[in-house]
């Protein structure tokens, strides 16, 4: 890993292109090695990407999101899957980021053509225990994803 890494317009521009071309309509750019205890990365989202509501409980980890470009709708869910809170996060403010304790059900939706977020959480990353998905909501690839995205977006109009 490089000693320093600069977050500049060239890096963001290349990641935006990559996210728009990706099947999942998003991409991550890691600044860390997978085994590091502090995971930090850019999460670049394009419109209509879907992030199934989830939490980090089995391997409890706090998370921090800061929007560097664009806007996202950040959703917090109750245990039964009802939406408890919604926060519009924007690079222009007034809300620019959010910090979550482990075990909080959450999701986010991209409200602009593209959104670039800096995300930090505890590591190391282990995909087998990283996330628990909420059973009330569809997983990626499900036929109800488009409808769910539209519903999430409607909460921020």
PLM-predicted stretches and their roles:
Residues 1-39, 85-90, 149-157:
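A short, N-terminal "cap"/entry segment at the start of jelly-roll beta-barrel domains
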Residues 25, 42-61:
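Conserved short histidine dyad/triad with adjacent acidic residue
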Residues 33, 55-57, 110:
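Non-cytosolic beta-sheet module surface loops
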Residues 41-43, 62-67, 98, 108:
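His/acidic/aromatic-lined binding-pocket segments of jelly-roll/cupin-type domains
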Residues 53, 74-76, 98-100, 106-111, ...:
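Short beta-strand His + acidic residue motifs that chelate non-heme Fe in jelly-roll/DSBH
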Residues 60-79:
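Glycine- and acidic-residue-biased ligand/ion/polar-headgroup-sensing regions
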Residues 64, 78-103:
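Short acidic-glycine-tyrosine-enriched beta hairpin
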Residues 82, 107-157:
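Double-stranded beta-helix
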């Amino acid at each position: 890993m490089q000693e320093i890494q600069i977050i500049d317009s060239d890096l963001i521009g290349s990641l935006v292109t990559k996210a728009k071309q990706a099947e999942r309509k998003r991409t991550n750019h890691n600044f860390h090695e997978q085994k590091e205890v502090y995971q930090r990365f850019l999460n670049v989202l394009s419109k209509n990407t879907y992030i199934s509501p989830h939490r980090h409980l089995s391997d409890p980890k706090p998370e921090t999101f800061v929007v560097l470009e664009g806007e996202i709708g950040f959703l917090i869910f109750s245990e039964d899957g009802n939406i408890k809170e919604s926060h519009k996060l924007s690079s222009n403010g007034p809300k620019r980021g959010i910090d979550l304790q482990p075990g909080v059900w959450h999701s986010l939706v991209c409200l602009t053509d593209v959104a670039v977020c800096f995300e930090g959480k505890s590591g190391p990353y282990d995909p087998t225990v990283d996330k628990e998905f909420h059973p009330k909501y569809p997983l990626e690839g499900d036929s109800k994803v488009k409808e769910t995205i539209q519903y999430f977006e409607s909460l921020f109009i």
